[in-house]
């Protein structure tokens, strides 16, 4: 598109430095791309650029690292990091919280990638029958029938839909209680929408509460909660659902799918674009304030959705600051080391300790 400016430096080299852009470019945040039905908003444009860039840098991600230049400063002791975290919360005018899989895992939703007690509690019969070593493994299995596939998918969806609000989320809520904030998440497990109204959360990877047409014949999504409950009840101790309960598109009759990235032909229609509009509008309204970008539990599968946009935006907004909490990595780009904090520790412990420090 003529005149479009990149948000980041996309020069091909082993380690990428975050690049500043002029503020006029930042605020001109709606781009129209040919052959698209919807305008591309600020945050989605940033994700698209970072995702496209990442294709040539997969070796760094596969090894558990990042291609960005990182700070080489020695981290402060844990207690000091907690004090700094609390201080940065208090000093910020507003907070954009980005929650990923590590946040839910820290509160007991740790059945996705591990064959542990939580996984066995909810998926034991499938582990015994198929040998899965985590919930995600079953999500990509080549099921022999639709009835078998939905026996598993219904169990998976039911597990997240009926999970209680996990403690790290309650602690985060207390930390944010006195702030102007917005939540961006790649989690599909509905934890955030159990806590906050729809307009305060952007679920850019989908939501387990909805079905879509597997053929994307329609832009519509529809309720999955009641059909999932019916399938689980009918299945009982078995592994398959009755044929008549296999969910189908009410428009074309094709098999339905959960409205989430990763299960198939993810519908990127009006509901999807609404998520990006919400976070982009929030950024547009707050960009000249002291924004704290708070990243929680981002892994190496999808860094271009929360982590790398937060890095780029912190670098681009002169009053912004950044905090990351992760139990496996401690990534802080050199470009934002003077305005950033990276804590490598259990997310549940960190949020509980920050809440205590703030007296909330």
What are the language-model segments listed below?
Residues 5, 10-11, 27, 33:
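Short terminal hydrophobic/aromatic SLiMs and anchors at protein ends
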Residues 22, 26-360:
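Conserved catalytic alpha/beta core of Sir2/sirtuin-type deacylases, generalized to analogous enzyme cores
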Residues 5, 14, 20:
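Cationic, low-complexity basic patches in intrinsically disordered or flexible, solvent-exposed regions
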Residues 16-17, 33:
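Alpha-helical interaction segments
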């Amino acid at each position: 598109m003529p005149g479009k400016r990149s948000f980041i430096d996309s020069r091909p080299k082993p380690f990428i430095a975050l690049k500043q852009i002029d503020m006029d470019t930042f605020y001109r945040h709606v781009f129209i791309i040919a052959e698209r039905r919807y305008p591309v908003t600020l945050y989605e444009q940033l994700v698209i650029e970072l995702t496209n860039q990442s294709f040539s840098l997969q070796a760094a991600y596969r090894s558990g690292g990042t291609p960005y230049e990182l700070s080489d400063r020695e981290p402060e002791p844990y207690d000091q990091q907690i004090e700094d975290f609390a201080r940065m919360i208090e000093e910020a005018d507003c907070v954009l919280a980005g929650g990923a899989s590590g946040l839910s895992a820290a509160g007991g939703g740790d059945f996705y990638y591990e064959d542990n007690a939580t996984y066995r509690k909810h998926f034991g019969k499938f582990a015994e029958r198929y040998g899965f070593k985590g919930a995600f493994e079953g999500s990509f299995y080549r099921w022999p029938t639709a009835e078998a596939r939905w026996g598993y998918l219904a169990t998976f969806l039911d597990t997240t839909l009926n999970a209680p609000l996990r403690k790290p989320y309650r602690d985060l809520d207390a930390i944010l209680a006195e702030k102007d904030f917005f939540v961006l998440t790649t989690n599909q497990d509905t934890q955030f929408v159990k806590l906050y109204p729809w307009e305060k959360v952007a679920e850019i990877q989908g939501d387990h509460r909805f079905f879509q047409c597997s053929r994307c014949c329609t832009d519509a999504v529809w309720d999955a909660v009641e059909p999932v409950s019916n399938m689980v009840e009918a299945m009982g101790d078995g592994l398959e659902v009755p044929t008549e309960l296999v969910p189908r598109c009410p428009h074309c009759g094709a098999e339905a799918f959960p409205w989430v990235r990763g299960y198939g032909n993810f519908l990127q229609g009006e509901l999807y674009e609404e998520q990006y509009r919400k976070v982009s509008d929030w950024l547009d309204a707050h960009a000249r304030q002291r924004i704290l970008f708070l990243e929680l539990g981002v892994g190496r599968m999808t860094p271009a959705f929360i982590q790398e946009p937060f890095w780029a935006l912190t670098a681009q907004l002169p009053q912004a600051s950044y905090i990351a909490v992760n139990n496996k990595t401690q990534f802080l780009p050199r470009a934002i080391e003077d305005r950033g904090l990276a804590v490598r520790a259990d997310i549940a412990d960190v949020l509980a300790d920050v809440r205590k420090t703030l007296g909330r």
